[in-house]
Amino acid sequence: MAKKLYDVVALGEVLIDFTQNGKSAQGNGLFEANPGGAPGNVLAMLNNLGKKTSFIGKVGNDQFGLMLKETLEGLGIGTENLMLDDEVRTTLAFVHTFEDGDRDFSFYRNPGADMMLRADEVQEELIQSARIFHFGTLSMTHDGVREATKKALDVAKASGVMISFDPNLREPLWKSLDEAKEQVLYGLQYTDILKISDNEIQWLTGEEDYTEGVKKIREMKDIPLILVSMGKEGSRAYYKDMIVEAKPFLQKNTIETTGAGDTFCANILNYVLDNGLENLTEEGLKEMLTFANAAASIITTKKGALKVMPTKADVEEFLANNG
């Protein structure tokens, strides 16, 4: 059995989120280039919590790709399986923020380098050396990277590595929502920890009620721990026959919600790394959700996500003032 060098290894996308940042003297909109991408955000938060992480994926050998590599390394995230593509450029996302802080995305990814990761480029021993393997569905939208993701899942499962899945559905990146659903259902078959949003669970299961949705998912695969993030309604954990809910922390100074779900997810994984997945209690789950909700709330007051994740001390201080 490979030695567990890493707490979490994630496969997927790192990209540049261009977020609105005021206007120029000429009245033109200014955009700030923020390193992002859901799996990268998750690892950045975990690193802030003292966990050892590494990223599997591909960026362009261009100014943005090199910036992302440098950013990950600066945060202490392993890049031994971050590939550089000489042909295809780094994926870009333009984030349009609404007044309540929610957002919409326009992607420049036709193709983007993250889609070009091949199965033969995935380092099996890296996955085998992790306690948790984490993935999403941006790495399942197109053939090449889909095969890389499936290979990684097979390696993780065969090696007894715990598998965490956040579908993170981005509709514009799929040929059709039917194809998206097919790939999410494929991913569920491997999953030990599922983080899913309120909208995603309703879309996936056709159930308005989240508990009914969870029942449907568990009929397909008995996933031990399912987290439903409900935005302004807080979050829920479904563990064995327990349902635990925690209220949100709503900020007056919310700027945008980019990275909130990833921050939440990372804090859940951190709790599982510290406490295991076998004997979680109602009290422990409530504490886990409360901490994760608080961390997610903090990130909504900042532009971008990957480089500005809160520390454990930030979250503890926030809870002391808002608990």
What are these regions (language model features)?
Residues 1-9, 154, 210-323:
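Conserved phosphate-binding/catalytic region of the ribokinase-like
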Residues 52-135, 316-323:
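Conserved N-terminal subdomain of the carbohydrate kinase-like
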